[in-house]
């Protein structure tokens, strides 16, 4: 039995930035630092930041006056930003810049009076934040959420000739393209983003897991169950006909999964750290894995800048 590692895998630039913002805020301002929602969807990362002095909350009313709060990588609504400003909270924004790009698109369409269709998963914090970029004060348009291709048939927009779409950044590329095609068939005048909203890291990791699926008879995806992009990776492998499981860490591996398997693929979602992958590799060796190799993949060199104040504090 051998193990093939996907490439790329694990942390993306947006996740790296978000985690670093929390760490540096704690180092420079001191604990506690409040973080609205899990800064990224990974239990190991969140637990580590808690030990350093981060306090995770779901709403700003859990944050004391005069405290520092960090917005998670998934982004927040305008209402949350306005509440933080009204209360005078010190804010560091860890929203992924690629999510911010989608926010700007929604706000632009809103100002132009267009209706907007957001393709995404209801209840996901990124979707809630993006939906919250629309406001009646900004324009006359309306925003609609579409989760799957079936909902396109029943969608009833107010302005079919003045319509645009945008997407959550962590969706299945194939599923999203199907929804977009159905929307365009129904609303030929619909506008789209200048560049795809699904982020480069999501695309690259989905391409990599498909490479694994072509060569393996089992694919393990390291990631937490509330991680959208990690779930999509496991779904893609299964869709390509390969047995696949999403695991938080090595302790969740069932030895029965690898019985009779010759080639095990291993990847990690964009919010899963390499240390968890290393732990899975160690467990697979204990279960009989004889060799580990890494597939070629798309190189990633993207780096997102930290907030200016945290950059300055590092050298002061």
UniProtKB/Swiss-Prot annotation:
InterPro entries: LytB/IspH (IPR003451). Isopentenyl diphosphate binds at residues 41, 74, 124, 227-229, 271. Keywords: 4Fe-4S, Iron, Iron-sulfur, Isoprene biosynthesis, Metal-binding, Oxidoreductase. Binds 1 [4Fe-4S] cluster per subunit. It is an enzyme of class 1 (oxidoreductase). It catalyses: isopentenyl diphosphate + 2 oxidized [2Fe-2S]-[ferredoxin] + H2O = (2E)-4-hydroxy-3-methylbut-2-enyl diphosphate + 2 reduced [2Fe-2S]-[ferredoxin] + 2 H(+); dimethylallyl diphosphate + 2 oxidized [2Fe-2S]-[ferredoxin] + H2O = (2E)-4-hydroxy-3-methylbut-2-enyl diphosphate + 2 reduced [2Fe-2S]-[ferredoxin] + 2 H(+). GO terms for molecular function: 4 iron, 4 sulfur cluster binding; 4-hydroxy-3-methylbut-2-enyl diphosphate reductase activity; metal ion binding. This is 4-hydroxy-3-methylbut-2-enyl diphosphate reductase. It comes from Xanthomonas axonopodis pv. citri (strain 306). The gene is ispH.
């Amino acid at each position: 039995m051998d193990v093939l590692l996907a490439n790329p895998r694990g942390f993306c630039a947006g996740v790296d930035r978000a985690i670093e913002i929390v760490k540096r805020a704690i180092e420079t301002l001191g604990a506690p630092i409040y973080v609205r929602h899990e800064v990224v969807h990974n239990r190991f990362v969140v637990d580590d930041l808690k030990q350093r002095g981060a306090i995770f909350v779901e709403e700003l009313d859990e944050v004391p006056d005069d405290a520092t709060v960090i917005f998670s990588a998934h982004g927040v609504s305008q209402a949350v930003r306005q509440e933080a400003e009204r209360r005078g909270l010190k804010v560091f924004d860890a929203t992924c810049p690629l999510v911010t790009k989608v926010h700007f698109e929604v706000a632009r369409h809103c100002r132009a009076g267009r209706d907007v269709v957001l393709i995404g998963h209801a209840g996901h914090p990124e979707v809630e934040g993006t939906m919250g970029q629309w406001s009646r004060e900004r324009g006359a348009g309306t925003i609609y959420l579409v989760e799957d291709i079936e909902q396109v048939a029943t969608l009833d927009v107010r302005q079919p000739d003045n319509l645009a779409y945008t997407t959550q950044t962590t969706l299945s590329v194939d599923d999203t393209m199907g929804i977009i095609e159905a929307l365009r068939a129904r609303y030929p005048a619909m506008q789209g983003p200048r560049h795809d909203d699904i982020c480069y890291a999501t695309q690259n990791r989905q391409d990599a897991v498909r490479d694994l699926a072509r060569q393996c008879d089992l694919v393990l995806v390291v990631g937490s169950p509330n991680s959208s992009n990690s779930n999509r990776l496991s779904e893609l492998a299964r869709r390509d006909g390969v047995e696949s499981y999403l695991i938080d860490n090595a302790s969740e591996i069932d030895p029965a999964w690898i019985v009779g398997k010759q080639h095990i693929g291993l990847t990690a979602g964009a919010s899963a750290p390499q240390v968890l992958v290393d732990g899975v590799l160690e467990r697979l060796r204990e279960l009989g894995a004889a060799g580990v190799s890494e597939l070629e993949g798309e190189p990633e060199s993207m780096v997102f800048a930290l907030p200016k104040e945290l950059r300055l504090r590092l050298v002061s």
